UniProtKB/Swiss-Prot annotation:
EC number(s) reported in the record: 5.3.1.12
HAMAP family, per the entry: UxaC
Name of this protein: Uronate isomerase
Family: Belongs to the metallo-dependent hydrolases superfamily. Uronate isomerase family.
Length: 470
């Protein structure tokens, strides 16, 4: 019987253990997509307690707690921090088989140093007190944890109207050598069908000093904000393409669509598709000119529980996987961006694992001459960010493309404790390659495969995003 979560956790062959301990373990972290609050980095935030750093804002944990029968008051409600932590501690023993069980104990191990102890009601007091004592120390501030975890770069997720003032504070601080760069997330400028669109156009117009009436005005406003982001070191965009749409339009049609929407009219599905296509093609060209990377996160079915959405708002754990087809529209969109050779470096993520092979083959259609891995099939996202999901994604990428050129893992997280997801990924990667070697499916060449592992863990992402590190 193998003990739970030792130093060789998941490493079930001798070759996997060598790969992980000698090549993967000590690689720095290049976390190119996350949802960390940049203000907390700028202020070097001190966390009040374990709830504040661990449960606050974590919809993964809230979903599990609800499934375990925990009242909403103890998830997102007005219960005390300690009450919410105790509700989580009571839920954890029920999460065996869920990635939350592994994540929880990896996060207690690093950075808190808690090993050989499982979180449960019987250990909750001890773990609460031990972690809170550590959180009072300098090494456990927001920046302190990033340094402990050997982070070199994080890419936050930011709206085009954001001032980026917190990124500027971090950039000017010579005592802190971790890059904290904005990522451009223009969903609100793109989702013309949403009730909030007109208010957002007013805000975008204000910050860009642009009167947005025609489509060219919107392009001008977005260009000004792209320049603003570029001035703060941005090299990455991110789009939530819950459904991929494609429909072409003339300039006159786009002007009419925008004018009608700004006048409060409801658009047809075809008009929405025309507008979204035009925005994505325009932005893709801008990214290509600037050498940016675009990311498309495809296939989320959001805010399914309307009653809870009205009570709690979005991003609180009521989203799931969509099963809408995407292949034809995505192909047309990428081909359109590529017509003038203005398809930027692109990472495609799917939420439905049924679509893994769709994306794994799609990227091969648009690889760029002289650029290794220009088109990427992104790491297992959200509900696929677990052992089977990561194995599936990497296996299918290896079968249909080049795993060796993969840009690897990202946390996609709101928590400063989520950096152990990189460790989890690295262990799974080494386990997978180790099994290939054990089965005679890959050569037992530690130098060859060790270099490949180092590249996937860090070097490929560093080179792909072309961000100069401190």
């Amino acid at each position: 019987m193998t003990p739970f979560m030792t130093e060789d956790f998941l490493l079930d062959t001798e070759f996997a253990r060598r790969l992980y301990h000698d090549y993967a373990k000590d690689q720095p972290i290049f976390d190119y997509h996350c949802h960390l609050p940049p203000q907390q980095v700028a202020e070097n935030y001190r966390f009040k307690n374990l709830y504040d750093i661990w449960l606050k804002g974590d919809h993964y944990k809230w979903r599990a707690m609800r499934t375990n029968g925990v009242p909403e008051r103890l998830c997102t409600g007005d219960a005390s921090d300690r009450e919410k932590f105790d509700a989580w501690a009571a839920t954890v023993p029920h999460t065996i088989g869920n990635p939350l069980y592994h994540w929880t104990h990896l996060e207690l191990r690093r950075p808190f140093g808690i090993t050989g102890k499982l979180l449960s009601p019987s250990t909750a007091d001890e773990i609460w007190d031990q972690c809170n004592d550590l959180l009072a120390q300098d090494a456990f501030s927001a920046r302190g944890i990033m340094k402990q975890m050997n982070v070199k770069m994080v890419g936050t997720t930011d709206d085009p109207i954001d001032s980026l003032e917190h990124h500027a504070v971090v950039a000017k601080d010579t005592s802190f050598d971790i890059k904290v760069l904005p990522s451009w997330r223009p969903d609100k400028a793109f989702n013309i069908e949403q009730a909030t669109f007109n208010d957002y156009m007013a805000k975008l117009g204000e910050v860009s000093d642009t009167d947005i009436r025609r489509f060219a005005d919107l392009q001008s406003a977005l260009t000004k904000r792209l320049d603003h982001f570029a001035a703060h070191g941005c090299k990455v965009s991110d789009h939530a393409l819950d459904v991929v749409l494609f429909a072409e339009a003339t300039d006159a049609e786009l002007d009419a669509i925008l004018a009608r929407r700004l006048a409060g009219e409801t658009l047809s599905a075809h008009e929405v598709a025309q507008f979204k296509t035009a925005v994505l093609v325009f932005l893709g060209a801008e990214y290509a000119r600037r050498g940016w990377v675009q990311q498309y996160h495809i296939g989320a079915l959001r805010n399914n529980n309307l009653r809870q959405f009205k009570l709690l708002g979005p991003d609180v754990g009521f989203d799931s996987i969509n099963d809408r087809p995407m292949a034809e529209e995505l192909s047309k969109l990428l081909s359109k961006q590529n017509e003038e050779n203005l398809l930027p470096k692109t990472i495609l993520y799917c939420l439905n694992p049924r679509d893994n092979e769709v994306l794994g083959t799609m990227i091969g259609n648009f690889q760029g001459e002289g650029m290794p891995g220009k088109m990427q099939f992104g790491s297992g996202w959200w509900f696929n960010d677990q052992k089977d999901g990561m194995e599936r994604q990497m296996t299918q990428l290896a079968q249909l493309g080049l795993l060796s050129r993969f840009v690897g893992m990202l946390t996609d997280s709101r928590s400063f404790l989520s950096y152990t997801r990189h460790e989890y990924f690295r262990r799974i990667l080494c386990q997978m390659i180790g099994r290939w070697v054990a089965a005679g499916e890959a050569p037992a060449d530690i130098a060859l495969l060790g270099e490949m592992v180092k590249n996937i863990c860090f070097n490929n992402a560093r080179d792909y995003f072309a961000i100069e590190l401190n």
